[in-house]
Structure formats: structure tokens, C-alpha cells
């Protein structure tokens, strides 16, 4: 983002809540954490099932045998990564697959967590964690959220109305 030429100031005000509002927010954050952890658990199971399959193991073995720095291996690695991605996509291991899967987990909490929050807020967070682990060097494994780890939720609405 481009730096602004005008002088700017940021004002941070504390959010003063009544006890019942605080309790309602805490309940929704806890429910979001439970949905997140349930989704992580289910997707880890799905990933473990594909990891023990023969085609996936063969692809991984070939990927590990090649060197990314070697110019001759780069094209082969690219095709192997594409094959692995196709294999993962067949079981619904994509952002849209996660958004489709979350409908099974938030229904029980439908009074507190709406579909827009679950589909556009929680599922992309779970996908981002798996994406780091699978496709980037940043992540080694996906962690569950501890109690009081979630401090905000977001949803999405086409009409612009929230809640």
C-alpha cells in the first residue's frame, strides 16, 4: 500500500460491553473454536487417508528424489506437483472443498454461528493452515486452536447486511 502524504492519526477506543454482551461474544468465539477444531480433525483424517494411498506415496517419493535447484528436474517437479494437486482436489482438498465440508459442522450451532461466518470466516482459516503445511515451507503441521485463541469472527454478505 502506498504511504499517505497527509498527516494521519489513529485513535483506539476501548470497547465497553455489558456482561451479557461479553458472555454472548465469548460463547460465539468458543463455538467458532470448536467448529475450527472439528474441521481440522476431519480434514486431517481425510489427508491421512490420501497420504497412505499408493499413488500419493509414489508421487511424494518422486518429488523427494528430485532436486529443485537442478534445471533438468524443475519441469518434472512441476508436473509431479500438479499431479499431487489433482489427487488432492479429487478428495475435495481445496478452499472450495473446505467451504463445502463446513456445512456438516456448523449446522448444530446454527443459532449462534451463521452460514456466512462459517463458510467465509472459519473455513478459509482452516484452508490457510493446510495450505501453509502442504504448499509452502512455512508450516510443518496444522495446530488446533486452544481455548480463548479466537478473538474475532468475520462473515460475508452480498447485500452488505451483516448479522
Question: Model regions: which residues?
Answer:
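Nucleic-acid substrate recognition interfaces
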Residues: 1-163
Amino acid at each position: 500500500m502506498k504511504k499517505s502524504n497527509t498527516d494521519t492519526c489513529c485513535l483506539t477506543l476501548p470497547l465497553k460491553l455489558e456482561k451479557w454482551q461479553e458472555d454472548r461474544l465469548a460463547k460465539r468465539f468458543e463455538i467458532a473454536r470448536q467448529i475450527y477444531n472439528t474441521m481440522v480433525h476431519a480434514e486431517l483424517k481425510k489427508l491421512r487417508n490420501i497420504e497412505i494411498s499408493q499413488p500419493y506415496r509414489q508421487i511424494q517419493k518422486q518429488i523427494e528424489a528430485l532436486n529443485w535447484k537442478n534445471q533438468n528436474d524443475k519441469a518434472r517437479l512441476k508436473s509431479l506437483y500438479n499431479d499431487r494437486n489433482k489427487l488432492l482436489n479429487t478428495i475435495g482438498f481445496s478452499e472450495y472443498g473446505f467451504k463445502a465440508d463446513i456445512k456438516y459442522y456448523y449446522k448444530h450451532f446454527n443459532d449462534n454461528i451463521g452460514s456466512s461466518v462459517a463458510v467465509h470466516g472459519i473455513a478459509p482459516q482452516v484452508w490457510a493452515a493446510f495450505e501453509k503445511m502442504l504448499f509452502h515451507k512455512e508450516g510443518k503441521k496444522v495446530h488446533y486452536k486452544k481455548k480463548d485463541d479466537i478473538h474475532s469472527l468475520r462473515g460475508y454478505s452480498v447485500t452488505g447486511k451483516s448479522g
